[in-house]
Amino acid sequence: MAAPVEQTIKLQIKGGQANPAPPIGPALGQHGVNIMEFCKAFNSRTEDRMGTLLPVEITVYADRSFDFIVKSPPASVLLKQKADIETAAGDPLRDDAGTVTWDDCLDIADQKLQDLNAHTVEKGASMVAGTARSMGITVEGKPAHE
């Protein structure tokens, strides 16, 4: 029988670059998790996505063992990559940070569909387009009915 769940920890870590420094070390250390074991497991599982910010959900059990789930990168990170920008607009209503196409939004939604609260790729793309607008990124070619 598996040990009961003690805690669920949510972090955002760059793929392949987990180390015991903050924020990982303190977050795991206070629950008694072997930090180096987590870092090695995370880095080996995410070496193909080196440097990309990845949300991870760590489940800590009462016997101090753990499991973790690596999710897809945040839509904001993927939008910045597609728009080829470093940061979003400070004031999205006045400043234009960049431009993406509707097809870019569809690609991002397809990649994130399992993590989005949407049933179809088109609805997910609408959510991604909303994130883009809140970042000051213009979405070109969006269908009128969407």
From Swiss-Prot:
Please give the Pfam families that the UniProt record associates with this protein. Answer: Ribosomal_L11 (PF00298), Ribosomal_L11_N (PF03946)
Report whether Ribosomal protein shows up as a keyword of the record. Answer: yes
Keyword Cytoplasm found: no
UniProt keywords (A-Z) are: Methylation, Ribonucleoprotein, Ribosomal protein, RNA-binding, rRNA-binding
Q: What are the protein's GO molecular function terms?
A: large ribosomal subunit rRNA binding; structural constituent of ribosome
Q: Name one GO cellular component term.
A: cytosolic large ribosomal subunit
Q: Which SMART domains match?
A: RL11 (SM00649)
Top-level taxon in the UniProt lineage: Bacteria
The record's subunit annotation is: Part of the ribosomal stalk of the 50S ribosomal subunit. Interacts with L10 and the large rRNA to form the base of the stalk. L10 forms an elongated spine to which L12 dimers bind in a sequential fashion forming a multimeric L10(L12)X complex.
Q: What job does this protein perform?
A: Forms part of the ribosomal stalk which helps the ribosome interact with GTP-bound translation factors.
Q: Which NCBIfam families match?
A: L11_bact (TIGR01632)
**Family assignment from sequence similarity:** Belongs to the universal ribosomal protein uL11 family.
Q: What protein am I looking at? A: Large ribosomal subunit protein uL11
Give the classification, highest ranks: Bacteria, Pseudomonadati, Rhodothermota, Rhodothermia, Rhodothermales
